[in-house]
Amino acid sequence: MTSTPGACLPGYASHFGLNNIPFGIASSDLHPNPQSVTRFEDNVIFLADIEALQEIKDLPPNTLSQPTLNDLAALPRSIHQEIRTHLQTLLKSSSLPSKALEPLASIRMHLPMRTPDFTDFSCSADHVLNASEAMTGSRSSPPSFYHQPVG
């Protein structure tokens, strides 16, 4: 699933500075394959284009080129912090490679994670019984709970 180009509206540049470096998945005409990105002000940074990040010792090759963040998210928090620290250093010194930087208007965003299975715990019998007890004082499920979906 993708959004249309420019769907990340400008005007929120102040939310994306050195202290807020989020990870996402994007593509563009120059980067046609969805891959890991971050946002800085009104620009998107394609992480796979930054050679300094490839030198991070425990970062497996091609992790930042994947079409989802699953592989990156599975890594220890220390790796995420190291990526952010490298990015902060590069941004402070204005030494990001130009090929990694694209204006927000040219970007297509993609779903960041592949989620093959999903369970909504709020639909479970345990949750329904706990919620019932919290609201009414007694543990009971609605008469229709086992016959139709909750929601």
Model-derived regions, located:
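Active-site microenvironments in enzyme catalytic cores
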Residues: 2-28, 39, 51-151
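Glycine-rich N-terminal segment of FAD-binding domains in flavoprotein oxidoreductases
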Residues: 30-33, 46
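A conserved glycine-rich beta-strand in the N-terminal activation segment of trypsin-fold
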Residues: 33-39
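Beta-propeller domains
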Residues: 40-45
